[in-house]
Amino acid sequence: MNIKKTLTALLAGTALLTAGCVGGGDSANKMDTPKEGPVELQVSAAASLTDAMKELGAMYEENNKEVHIVYNFGSSGALQQAIENGGAADVFVSAAQKQMNALDEKKLLADGTRVDLLINDVVLITAKDSKLNLPDFKAVLDPQVTHIALGEPKGVPVGQYSEEVFTKLGILDQVKAKAVYGSDVRQVLSWTETGDADCGVVYATDAAVSDKVK
């Protein structure tokens, strides 16, 4: 599949979720050509949107029987690089502007198709059975907190947003000394759930789907 022919791009983040397309690709052509069975729509999406995308996808498939959605979830940075290298994707859902801008600069998005969709928030979480009391982000400086799970800031948007928060609070260097970096937001969530990290920074939507964190 030639990704330069067709790519629908969605952008989500602590700021907002944006949508866009790259015109006329393989899946679009397949939809114009009668064939047996449903057309596969390949969706590359940020791991933070796993649950939301599957729920939306199920509703879409219910109303569009000719389409079957195939998902590829991962960090936005890794997905961006895969698309740039020609990886198959019809839909891209990123968790930050940075990755979408990079694709735009390389002419992988169709002109005028990016649309802001929604807002998400980053939150500080601990395991449900944790005895730590962390009422705000500054509380991570508590000596009892020795490991803070964060997304890897170069390729994981939630990690970028986390660094922005701690930078504004003037405590980024102290946080880095305690940080352990996950390859995507779901790894950050998992480490916090299991207690491998004392706390973590994830999207509010990730915290909401877990009954193992607070």
Regions found by a protein language model. Name each.
Residues M1-L10:
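Bacterial N-terminal signal peptides that target proteins for export
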Residues D90-S94:
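Periplasmic-binding protein-like
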Residues K106-T113:
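A short, gly/pro- and small-residue-rich
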Residues A15-G20:
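C-terminal motif of bacterial Sec signal peptides marking the signal peptidase cleavage site
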Residues C21-E62, G77, Q81-N85, A96-Q97, ...:
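Exported/periplasmic ABC-transporter solute-binding proteins
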Residues R114-V122:
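Short, glycine-/small- and polar/acidic-enriched structural segments
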